[in-house]
């Protein structure tokens, strides 16, 4: 449970800082730079902890490469959804990945959840949907870009709400499948190398297709502040992934995934503490339900 909470904090921080960077840079640039920073962090962590570099079997490497590719598509889908839809609603939809990973873990890994565990997972998912899908806030693309990055972003993008929801649902399924694969192979091959392989695959794949993407020259005009936000997003994401992997190694994938999926609460907390925002009754009810779910998961 502890590592699931750490993962939630890390991914919540990453989501917040990436959203700031998205105001000034294109989504694929944010993903590539932040993921590259994350890989460097994970490699340094692996070397520093003397993680066995050859502990991952060939079949596991193939599965983790797929996990990395699925994760990359999920990141791109989510960031595009946030760019054209309500960030809160998109985060709420995407965060249901915990339920997807939990179902896969029960069906494919044979994990067993007690009645309290099942109730905790259900409450956590319901609570985060209520908490994150509160009053809509302007999407990053809806606000006029500021700073040197404004020249990079180009025209404000617009999109169908249905498209945004579809992309968020796609990211939820992708995150769930990727989270399940990462959890399964963290149990088999240690908690660091699977993340290095999956993250590394994402970076190499995106770097390979970058020349084919529209706006591939989006690096021009990026200021240090934007690069800094992207770096923080990458470090927080990698730290969250390491915590998630460790949690699934020593505990259950289903429970760790469900707990980590409460990450959208972190941006809400930043808004309340730093910006003086007020939570709606729906959001407060969602947070109470999340806490109840965490208590049940702790008792499971």
Mark where each language-model region is.
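Alpha-helical transmembrane segments of compact multi-pass small-molecule transporters, enriched
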Residues: 36-42, 93-107, 201-205, 240-241, ...
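Transmembrane alpha-helical core positions of polytopic small-molecule transporters
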Residues: 11-12, 67-75, 97, 172-176, ...
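Structural signature of hydrophobic alpha-helical transmembrane segments
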Residues: 1-11, 55-71, 113-126, 190-204, ...
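Hydrophobic alpha-helical transmembrane segments in multi-pass integral membrane proteins
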Residues: 42-53, 101-116, 173-187, 236-251, ...
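Membrane-interface interhelical linkers
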Residues: 1-10, 17-29, 33-64, 75-84, ...
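Hydrophobic/aromatic residues within transmembrane alpha-helices
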Residues: 21, 30, 81, 107-113, ...
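C-terminal transmembrane-helix exit sites in multi-pass transporters
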Residues: 78, 99-119, 129, 209, ...
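Hydrophobic transmembrane alpha-helices of multi-pass small-molecule transport proteins
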Residues: 42, 103-106, 116-135, 143-151, ...
């Amino acid at each position: 449970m502890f590592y699931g909470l750490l993962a939630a904090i890390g991914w919540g921080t990453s989501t917040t800082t990436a959203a700031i960077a998205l105001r000034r840079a294109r989504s694929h640039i944010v993903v590539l730079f932040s993921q590259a920073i994350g890989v460097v962090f994970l490699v340094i962590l692996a070397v520093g902890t003397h993680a066995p570099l050859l502990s991952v079997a060939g079949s596991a490497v193939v599965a983790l490469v797929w996990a990395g590719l699925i994760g990359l598509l999920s990141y791109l889908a989510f960031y595009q959804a946030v760019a054209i839809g309500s960030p809160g609603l998109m985060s709420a939809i995407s965060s249901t990945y915990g339920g997807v990973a939990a179902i896969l873990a029960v069906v494919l890994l044979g994990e067993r959840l007690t009645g309290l565990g099942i109730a905790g997972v259900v409450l956590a998912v319901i609570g985060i949907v209520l908490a994150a899908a509160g009053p809509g806030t302007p999407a990053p693309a809806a606000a006029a870009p500021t700073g040197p990055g404004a020249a990079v972003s180009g025209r404000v993008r617009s999109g169908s709400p249905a498209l945004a929801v579809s992309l968020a649902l796609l990211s939820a399924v992708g995150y769930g499948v990727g989270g399940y694969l990462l959890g399964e192979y963290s149990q088999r091959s240690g908690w660091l190398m699977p993340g290095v392989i999956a993250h590394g695959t994402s970076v190499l794949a995106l770097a390979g297709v970058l020349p084919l993407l529209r706006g591939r020259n989006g690096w021009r005009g990026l200021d240090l502040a934007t690069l800094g936000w992207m770096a923080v997003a990458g470090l927080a994401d990698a730290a969250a992934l390491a915590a998630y992997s460790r949690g699934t190694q020593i505990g259950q994938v289903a429970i760790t995934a469900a707990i980590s999926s409460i990450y959208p609460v972190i941006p809400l907390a930043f808004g309340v503490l730093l910006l003086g925002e007020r939570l709606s009754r729906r959001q407060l009810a969602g947070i109470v339900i999340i806490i109840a779910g965490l208590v049940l998961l702790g008792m499971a």
